[in-house]
Amino acid sequence: KEILKSAVEKLNSEDVMPCLATVLVGDDPASATYVKNKHNACKKIGIKTMDHKLSADTTQKELDKIINNLNNDKEVHGILVQLPLPKQLNEFATVCRISPIKDVDGLTPQNVGLLSMGKSILKPCTPSGIMEMFYYYKINLEGKNVVMINRSNLIGKPLYHLLSQNNATVITCHSKTKNLNEHCKNAD
């Protein structure tokens, strides 16, 4: 937190006020809590936030317009569209609409591609936090067998790339994996 707070203060001294815009469609309690926690975390380190709460019956056109406006707003530095979206909305099209330089979740095709090539500018938060824990505790991943039970676009797939880039041998397991117990026994 202190490193982030210091970075925000440096940006402020250069007349840049970092701002995260969140977009929440619908009234899913877990999603609302997640977004609220993001706003609270930003507030603690001095990042301004914008909260866009949309009804569950929002159309793709309405959502696209909001994302376009946020992409074009020079005061907004990051955009987070809370997933999952209601069924009438296209998650892939929505993510693709976010400007890659404002994509804080690292889900746009451009950011996913850069991450897979080890050239990412923005890395997804949770996988980055997991890697920071390895660095903090000085855990060398080189040559280690890592079994990961997650293949989601937000956590599992990015974490796979980050672990591989640190020379770990990564086995990705999921709900259809057979002999999960055996895979886990072989993990370091």
Across the structure, where does each feature detected by a protein language model lie?
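Positively charged, low-complexity intrinsically disordered leader regions
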Residues: 1-16
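Short beta-strand elements in bilobed, periplasmic/extracellular small-molecule ligand-binding domains
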Residues: 20, 42-56, 170-173
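Non-catalytic terminal and connector segments of soluble metabolic enzymes
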Residues: 44-46, 69-71, 98-101, 184
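Short, well-structured alpha-helical segments in soluble
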Residues: 62-74
